[in-house]
């Protein structure tokens, strides 16, 4: 579960390395896979598309918390990770690194198509 002030890794090549969750969209207290959150960049690559300290939207693609699938198997990732998106929901980067859990019902299809592995 992701809440305010959670440090997250960035799983794309937009230029950000680490972001801080500063808000959750939809009036929730915690976010899970597929939810959109508001983040602030904390560390960036010098030649990236994003700037340090700027505010962006992001989609959660991996969480450390256990996720139960419909066949009662459990998936658990080693890190909390997000993909930065613009206001229309399109990813800022052109590649997504690491495995990605299947996002809910057709939303963010572009992120799933860019991912190396979809679970």
UniProtKB/Swiss-Prot annotation:
Keywords: Ribonucleoprotein, Ribosomal protein, RNA-binding, rRNA-binding. InterPro entries: Ribosomal_uL14, Ribosomal_uL14_bac-type, Ribosomal_uL14_sf. The keyword Calcium does not apply. SMART domains: Ribosomal_L14 (SM01374). GO terms for biological process: translation. GO terms for molecular function: large ribosomal subunit rRNA binding; structural constituent of ribosome. GO terms for cellular component: cytosolic large ribosomal subunit. HAMAP family: Ribosomal_uL14. Belongs to the universal ribosomal protein uL14 family. Part of the 50S ribosomal subunit. Forms a cluster with proteins L3 and L19. In the 70S ribosome, L14 and L19 interact and together make contacts with the 16S rRNA in bridges B5 and B8. Binds to 23S rRNA. Forms part of two intersubunit bridges in the 70S ribosome. This is Large ribosomal subunit protein uL14. It comes from Wolbachia sp. subsp. Brugia malayi (strain TRS). The gene is rplN.
């Amino acid at each position: 579960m992701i809440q305010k002030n959670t440090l997250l890794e960035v799983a794309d090549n937009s230029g950000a390395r680490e972001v801080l969750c500063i808000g959750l969209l939809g009036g929730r207290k915690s976010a899970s896979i597929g939810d959109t959150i508001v983040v602030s960049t904390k560390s960036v690559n010098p030649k990236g598309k994003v700037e340090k300290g700027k505010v962006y939207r992001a989609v959660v693609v991996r969480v450390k918390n256990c996720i139960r699938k419909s066949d009662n198997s459990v998936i658990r990732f080693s890190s909390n990770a997000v993909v930065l998106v613009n206001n229309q929901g399109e990813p800022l980067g052109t590649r997504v690194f690491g495995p990605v859990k299947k996002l809910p019902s057709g939303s963010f299809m572009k992120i799933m198509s860019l991912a190396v592995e979809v679970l």
